[in-house]
């Protein structure tokens, strides 16, 4: 065992996931008085042979589908598409898959009384918004809408978009969900989705992304019903080709008003043609300032597509949406939050999710870690079995405990970085380009403005998606057990990489 960087001989050898945290691994696995239970629900706008994947005609249908869970004390913490439907990716069957993450408190015996828990219901509101190049205008418009709803007692959950569907799906179902023939459609769905994964995207995807995705629809199928916008990139000033919804938890009784604000989100991007093939972002540098102030990271907003006629940018500017003072998170009254950020490969077999962040999430739930946001990306690849895989970024938080607070002193580097300060900080590639992945395999010591000394990055290099779960991301007694405590010795101001 050593800390030499492994050369990625093949794209399939890239890491199944990386974990970044403001804590060392032993602190992450320290139990608190609170724990969570999670329920993960998958939805599809298409027919599916898997009974565990819930068929919906619109993302608005999710509201009714989760009602029974709300009666059991669960609330939705995040709703997100499985892949980021950008450009031709909107034609992929997987672009019609959505995930809802629900959680409920698992109280200790001394907190067994549930009287403090308020009954909530899920609410979705359409949010007309133009996807202009400048994120500042979008941020102000969105934040005004979110804060206006918060004053009515609505707790913000996130944003979810739905692209317009073609009149015929890959499974042969019509736009309104009526199938030509039930048995035929189910078989057609499975065959066509398999064709997309194994054939249509071919070798391009195993490298870095979809260079050119063939159009399976005929001319008449490429035209949307009811004169809906086409799949083409929007022109400047036009709305994106879909709808954007704001998701809230609304409470029956009067609730304290929540307040929300935006924070910087900046990502460097690598492209092959117009396709985004890799991302670089310093997640903890961007968010730690807010976590230390007791804010909760709720969601993010990024305009992934470039208006026609514009030069393709080398970076994407968006914003995170934070809830002030961690409102609604048990025990976080004006206390800072510790954070975990997971870069996770999610594998899709056919039209169904095969491997994802679920096992890790259930393990961390026992230690009081709350999932607050999932950022899907447009980065795609094939695993060794020919299945589609996409990169997702998962954000979890937990109120700072006395021990962790004592070992994470405030440093001048724990602040919001802007402009050239942010560019000084080294970053880790999320993409599939072999050279970028090699460079990202280890993080060099940070320059001035570095992270606090206890901030960690955990990584294990294994071939992804060859079994039901990734090695190191399994549903064993401890997902993190393979990480040796002794590997977390580090020097002042240096973020370490655990090399296996």
From Swiss-Prot:
GO cellular component assignments: plasma membrane
Chain positions with Phosphoserine modification: 404, 429
The organism's place on the tree of life at top rank: Eukaryota
Biological process terms in GO annotation: dsRNA transport; response to exogenous dsRNA
Compartments where located: Cell membrane
Keywords associated with the record: Cell membrane, Lipoprotein, Membrane, Myristate, Palmitate, Phosphoprotein
Keyword set includes Metal-binding: no
Lipid attachment site numbers (N-myristoyl glycine): 2
Chain positions with Phosphothreonine modification: 408
Region (Disordered): 203-236, 406-500
UniProt feature, compositional bias: Low complexity: 467-478
Tissue specificity comment: Expressed in B-cells, heart, brain, spleen, large intestine and lung. Expressed in dendritic cells and macrophages.
Topology term for the membrane: Lipid-anchor
The UniProt record lists the keyword Transcription regulation: no
Lipid-conjugated positions (S-palmitoyl cysteine): 3
Main location: membrane
Knockout-associated phenotype: Double RFTN1 and RFTN2 mutant mice show no visible phenotype under pathogen-free conditions but show greatly reduced interferon beta production in splenic dendritic cells under poly(I:C) or lipopolysaccharide stimulation.
Compositionally biased tracts (Basic and acidic residues): 213-224, 409-424
Biased composition regions of type Polar residues, renumbered to the chain: 426-438
Function: Upon bacterial lipopolysaccharide stimulation, mediates clathrin-dependent internalization of TLR4 in dendritic cells, resulting in activation of TICAM1-mediated signaling and subsequent IFNB1 production. May regulate B-cell antigen receptor-mediated signaling.
Protein family (similarity comment): Belongs to the raftlin family.
Protein name: Raftlin-2
Organism, scientific name: Mus musculus (Mouse)
Organismal lineage: Eukaryota, Metazoa, Chordata, Craniata, Vertebrata
